[in-house]
């Protein structure tokens, strides 16, 4: 059995530590923050509780799988399936609830969006699209989500070979927007399904059409909510790791990954050197090379790839109750293409942003005092390249409040009694995410999946990677899968 050091206690690092410890390895996790979770943490202020990071929970079986690793009984992890994925709002007064039940969804679409002039109704277009999304998932998930793209034998499996005969249906030659525009007659539905590019911080007008795999997770499989909030994912996995004997060092920064020849030797901290047979970096791949492997050859093409979008998040304790809203809510921009041009071409904020509002107190009542709600309010932002955020954030706040007033008919200004803010510079500072990018690199390239850093070093023996900046990508499910891929690579090495 080997001595393994994991750098970073984000969700992928925790999952990797559990899987490797369950194989009998000695595992030490080193984390610069004062606790586990990375972006998936919580904060409390004046009787309000906020999940600070990822707010959408899909594929809960991936969490349950991690919590079943090792020779202990599976850990308890209560969660519920939701009857809807999101409430959508447009400024013209259109409101749409995306029900999980397909019959209710079809009825809602035809009632709220209306009947189009073609032979098919809008709901038929959506249901056909969701079947296509399921098709994409069935034929591409095995390779793009569950296997290393950087090992030749991954391409020799039966599911992958089978997928090659269907590749002409993957919309690889179209952008996500082009694929959706060809499928839907109504521009609101195009916009709704274009939104899924933002799930990995990308631009739907440039990202490949194969990203239409994403709606399958939300609409066909379903959306879920942990009974104790999203931070319960971190807490449960962390407690499982400790129970299995994983060791942790918090408030500890790594100075460098020590290499001799082409073999990893361990990790140097401020005060000591810790030897290891293997090192796993759950840190962002950019600072891993620039800060921890300064004397080693870096994969410059990967490191110079376009970063994903970042975010500005306002955590608001709000007085009052808002029945129109649910757990997940989207207020769409009237200029969606302009919003993405500003983000990716201009490195700027758009004056009419799409606003995402997450309110966990809708389901977890003790997240806010009686008569109040906890609002997690997010807009997409460009990655940090030195913009004047101190100037931009007050402008963004005002744009968001104006958007809420125009779309929901509510002036929130005198109802906000608690406020905290997260911006790209703070994201970068707290999580070492390069430029504050939420998902590492964007998918604004038809070959983006193949340009992500692999889960292993191609030059250094004993060095592995997991987390949102490497294959298969960002977000809770893909981070958990990166840990699974890494575990299989180490086991089969």
Language model region names:
Residues 22-45:
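Glycine-rich FAD pyrophosphate-binding loop
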Residues 213-264:
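Helical element adjacent to the flavin cofactor pocket in flavoenzyme catalytic cores
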Residues 3-29:
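N-terminal Rossmann-like FAD-binding beta1-loop-alpha1 element of flavoenzymes
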């Amino acid at each position: 059995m080997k001595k393994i050091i994991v750098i970073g206690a984000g969700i992928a690092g925790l999952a990797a530590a559990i899987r490797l410890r369950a194989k009998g390895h000695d595992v030490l996790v080193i984390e610069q923050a004062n606790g586990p979770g990375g972006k998936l943490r919580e904060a409390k202020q004046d009787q309000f509780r906020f999940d600070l990071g990822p707010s959408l929970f899909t594929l809960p079986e991936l969490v349950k799988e991690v919590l079943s690793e090792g020779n202990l009984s599976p850990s308890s992890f209560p969660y519920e399936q939701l009857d809807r994925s999101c409430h959508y709002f447009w400024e013209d007064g259109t409101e749409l609830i995306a029900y999980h039940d397909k019959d209710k969804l079809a009825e809602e679409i035809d009632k709220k969006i209306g009947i189009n002039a073609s032979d098919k109704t809008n709901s038929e277009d959506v249901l056909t699209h969701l079947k296509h999304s399921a098709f994409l998932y069935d034929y591409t998930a095995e390779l793009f989500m569950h296997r290393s793209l950087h090992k030749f034998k991954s391409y020799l499996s039966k599911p992958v070979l089978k997928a090659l005969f269907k590749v002409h249906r993957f919309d690889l030659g179209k952008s996500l927007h082009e694929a959706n525009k060809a499928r839907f007659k109504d521009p609101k539905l195009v916009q709704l399904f274009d939104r899924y590019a933002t799930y990995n911080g990308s631009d739907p007008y440039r990202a490949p059409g194969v990203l239409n795999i994403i709606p399958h997770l939300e609409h066909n499989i379903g959306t879920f909510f942990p009974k104790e909030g999203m931070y319960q994912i971190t807490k449960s996995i962390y407690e499982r790791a400790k129970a299995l004997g994983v060791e942790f060092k918090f408030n500890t920064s790594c100075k460098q990954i020590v290499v001799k020849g082409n073999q990893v030797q361990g990790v140097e901290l401020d005060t000591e050197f810790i030897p290891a047979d293997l090192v796993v970096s759950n840190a962002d791949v950019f600072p891993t090379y620039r800060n921890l492997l300064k004397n080693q050859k870096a994969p410059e093409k990967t490191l110079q790839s376009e970063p994903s979008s970042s975010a500005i998040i306002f955590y608001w304790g709000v007085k009052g109750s808002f029945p129109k809203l649910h757990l997940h809510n989207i207020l769409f921009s009237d200029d969606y293409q302009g919003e993405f041009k500003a983000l990716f071409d201009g490195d700027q904020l758009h004056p009419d942003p799409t606003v995402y509002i997450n309110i966990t107190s809708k389901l977890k009542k003790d997240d806010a005092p009686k008569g109040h709600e906890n609002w997690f309010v997010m807009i997409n932002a460009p990655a940090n390249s030195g913009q004047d955020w101190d100037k931009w954030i007050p402008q963004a706040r005002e744009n968001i409040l104006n958007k809420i007033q125009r779309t929901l008919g509510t002036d929130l200004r005198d109802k906000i009694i608690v406020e905290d803010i997260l911006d790209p510079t703070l994201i970068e500072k707290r999580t070492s995410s390069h430029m504050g990018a939420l998902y590492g690199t964007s998918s604004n390239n038809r070959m983006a999946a193949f340009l992500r850093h692999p889960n292993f070093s191609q030059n250094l023996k004993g060095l592995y990677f997991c987390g949102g900046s490497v294959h298969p990508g960002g977000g809770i499910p893909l981070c958990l899968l990166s840990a699974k891929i890494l575990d299989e690579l180490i086991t089969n090495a």
